[in-house]
C-alpha cells in the first residue's frame, strides 16, 4: 500500500480579500502560514513519510509546501509544475466575489466557480483544468505511487478538485458540491495498481 496526500495551500491574501485569484501569484497571509504549519503537524502526528512532493509554480502553494516540509522534518525532492496551477479565472481574476455575484447573480457565479464544463469569460473550466492536471497526475504522480513512493501534493482548490474528481470517480453533477478547505490534508491509501483503498481527512 502507498499513500497520497493532497493539500490545498493556506489562506492567501486574495482568499482573505474574497477575490478570484487564478494564476495571479499572490502570497500567503500570516494566518495561511499558521494553517500550513498546523497541516504539517497533522501529517506528522499521523506518522506519514513521503519520498517526493509535487506543487505548482505559484508561490502560495510553494510556500505552503516548504512550511509543511519544515514542520514534518522531511527533506524530500520538490517538483514544481504549472500543470498543478490553479484554474485560470480569466476576466474574473482580481475581482471581488461578492461584487461579481451582485453584478452577474449568485447562480451564474456559482456555475462559473463550481460547474465542470462552463468557463468564466476568457478563463478555464474545471474540464480544461483537468485536461492538464490528470495527464500530469498519471504520468508523474501515479508513476511514483506505483513505484512504491508516498507522495505529497500541495496545490490549489480547483487543480485538486479535478484530481479528487478523478480519484473518487465523481460525476459532473457531484463535483458541483465538492469544496476543498485550505490546508486540510486529504490522505488516500492506494493499492500497488493505483486503485483507491481508503480515504480520510486529517482534521486537528
Language-model segments: which ranges?
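Phosphate-coordination/substrate-recognition cap region in phosphate-metabolizing enzymes
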Residues: 38-110, 165-181, 186-189, 196
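Short, solvent-exposed aromatic-acidic interface loops
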Residues: 200-204
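GST superfamily/GST-like fold recognition
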Residues: 157-162, 197
